């Protein structure tokens, strides 16, 4: 055989591959079979209902927490799940808002104003319901030790001042620290300017980056059952059931009030706006947002979950990419309930009589204070002393109340976050569907409309 370039001749050689050994062929076949089984299981896992997987994780975590409370390594998936959500949420919000403003036709139309109205009105109504329940089912507390906490805001002015000053934090520091008021402020500024000044390449980059982050969030949420298992295990193994024995009535009052807000007040608001049966929307939001928020105990960590749910509800991305992180900051029904009930329980314990006018004033203060809980370390609990100051409660007593709050926080904070976070989606969807009705677009099928959604 001649080489075409050199013209030199080489003897013909018969090229033959070495036959694989039987055991090698068998091993490779087994590996491929295992890989195929793994892929099939992964696909089957992803196709199954996320809610059923989460419920299974809850049950498994509770059982393991009761049976083997010393196996602390079982809580690691929960820690990793919450950390992953908290890590990606700030940059997700920042990029999505910029991308929506720079690439879309986003205008801060009446939908945004209406969402803010819904957030504030529902928070005020939650505080009023808390007043009513506190009068109907009065509860006292056994005060023991004062809580060791950082500086408490001296008044509503300081809370609002901290909230506004926080807007002008360095944007990099805001993303690193999860300061969503500042993140939203800078994202809106950058997005508006980018729409006017940036080239097509820059806009495309942010659009692609938002898609990458959204896909990442989808993957994290897909692993939620393992995270919920770890979080449930940690709660049961650490606290057990003794908390219900010592503070059962207070927990029942808080839980009952929050359930009343979630299952009566919020549905009533949705019904008055849409004139449709609100419960299909309410239950979807509680099931797909509230359950996850209950275990993460962080509205910020639940932002990616809520954005994914808004996408499945067919909402405008330009709308929910702003309203959801805004809701995580100012939509605080649960916080208003906690501040109001804990304050009225304190006054009852001390024998201080509260008239109706004072209770309404407390509701207004609780509403304004609740909107500032995202800017206070410790959230709603550290705003209790400020509310108690309305009635002249001594500082050492209020710190004992805060201490009780921290003891029951495993239940209180979980339900508070679930109520707050599910409400973000409920009221965003309500404002969007109201806009659909006004513009002649049919509502989703679960609200007796004709628009079919993949949900």
Give residue spans per PLM region.
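Membrane-water interface of transmembrane alpha-helices in multipass transporters/channels
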Residues: 73, 109, 241-249, 276-284, ...
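Membrane-interface alpha-helices at helix entry/exit sites of multi-pass transporters
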Residues: 109-115, 219-222, 312-328, 357, ...
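Juxtamembrane helix-boundary/capping and inter-helix hinge elements in multi-pass membrane proteins
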Residues: 101-110, 196-200, 239, 275-278, ...
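Signature of multi-pass transmembrane helix bundles
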Residues: 42-67, 79-88, 110-280, 441-446, ...
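Transmembrane alpha-helical segments and their short flanking loops
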Residues: 341-455
């Amino acid at each position: 055989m001649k080489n075409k370039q050199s013209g030199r001749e080489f003897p013909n050689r018969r090229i033959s591959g070495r036959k694989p050994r039987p055991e090698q062929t068998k091993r490779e076949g087994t590996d491929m079979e295992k890989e195929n089984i793994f892929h099939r299981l992964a696909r089957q896992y992803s196709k199954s209902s996320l809610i059923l997987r989460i419920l299974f994780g809850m049950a498994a975590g509770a059982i393991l927490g009761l049976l083997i409370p010393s196996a602390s390594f079982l809580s690691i998936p929960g820690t990793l799940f919450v950390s992953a959500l908290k890590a990606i949420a700030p940059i997700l919000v920042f990029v999505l808002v910029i991308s929506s403003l720079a690439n879309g036709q986003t205008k801060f139309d009446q939908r945004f104003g209406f969402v803010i109205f819904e957030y504030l009105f529902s928070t005020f109504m939650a505080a009023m319901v808390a007043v009513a329940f506190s009068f109907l089912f009065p509860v006292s507390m056994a005060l023991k030790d004062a809580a060791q906490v950082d500086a408490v805001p001296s008044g509503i002015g300081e809370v609002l001042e901290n909230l506004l000053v926080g807007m002008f934090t360095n944007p990099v520091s805001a993303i690193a620290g999860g300061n969503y008021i500042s993140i939203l402020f800078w994202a809106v500024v950058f997005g508006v300017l980018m729409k006017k000044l940036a080239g097509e390449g820059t806009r495309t980059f942010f659009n692609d980056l938002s898609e990458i982050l959204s896909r990442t969030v989808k993957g994290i949420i897909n692993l939620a059952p393992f995270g919920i298992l770890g979080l449930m295990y940690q709660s049961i193994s650490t606290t057990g059931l003794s908390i219900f024995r010592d503070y059962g009535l207070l927990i029942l009052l808080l839980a009952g009030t929050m359930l009343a807000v979630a299952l009566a007040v919020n549905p009533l608001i949705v019904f008055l706006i849409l004139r449709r049966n609100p419960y299909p929307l309410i239950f979807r939001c509680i099931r797909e947002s509230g359950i996850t928020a209950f275990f993460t105990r962080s509205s910020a960590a639940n932002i990616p979950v809520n954005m994914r749910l808004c996408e499945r509800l067919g909402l405008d991305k330009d709308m929910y990419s702003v309203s959801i992180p805004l809701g995580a900051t100012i939509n605080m029904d649960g916080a208003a309930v906690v501040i109001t009930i804990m304050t009225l329980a304190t006054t009852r314990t001390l024998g201080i009589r509260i008239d109706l006018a004072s209770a309404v004033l407390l509701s207004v203060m609780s509403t304004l204070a609740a909107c500032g809980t995202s800017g206070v370390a410790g959230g709603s609990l550290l705003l209790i002393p400020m509310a108690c100051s309305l009635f002249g409660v001594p500082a050492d007593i209020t710190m004992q109340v805060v201490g009780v709050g921290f003891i029951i926080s495993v239940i209180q904070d979980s339900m508070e976050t679930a109520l707050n976070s599910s409400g973000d989606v409920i009221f965003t969807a309500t404002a969007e569907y109201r806009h659909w009705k006004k513009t002649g677009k049919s509502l989703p099928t679960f609200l007796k409309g004709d628009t079919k959604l993949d949900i």
